[in-house]
Amino acid sequence: MDVETWRHYFRVAKSYGINHYRFHSWCPPEACFEAADIEGIYLQAELPFWGWMGKDNTRLISYLREEGLRIQQEYGHHASFVMFALGNELSGDFEVMQSLVDTFRQADRRHLYAYGSNNYLGFKAGFGRTPGMETIVVD
């Protein structure tokens, strides 16, 4: 979609009182950020991941780290980019998640960071705010 199409959707959303868009397990394109900047919409980008994060999966962790840094480099300057999450309904090793969030926060302190959206659904141990997270996303 182009900037004007995104602007149309954001204006409709605003007419219903919506001011925040979460992009489930993906990052929207440049046109979306440009339109959101113009229309005053807050955006939450996410890494393209949904599942278990473990220390042993070094290839995955490396990919997510590199992808997150690329997303920040490409879109982080937009005023509409207010939140960044590691993915959707994640579970796994808190240390791995904390390491990724720390890396992203050090690269760009302008955003709010979360380990993920709707994390640890059905798992009592991970319920609620976790140290190192600045926001909790549940929808």
Regions found by a protein language model. Give the residues of each.
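N-terminal carbohydrate-binding accessory modules
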Residues: 1-13, 34
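A conserved hydrophobic secondary-structure block that centers on an alpha-helix together
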Residues: 10, 15-22
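Substrate-binding/catalytic cleft of secreted carbohydrate-active enzymes
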Residues: 20-139
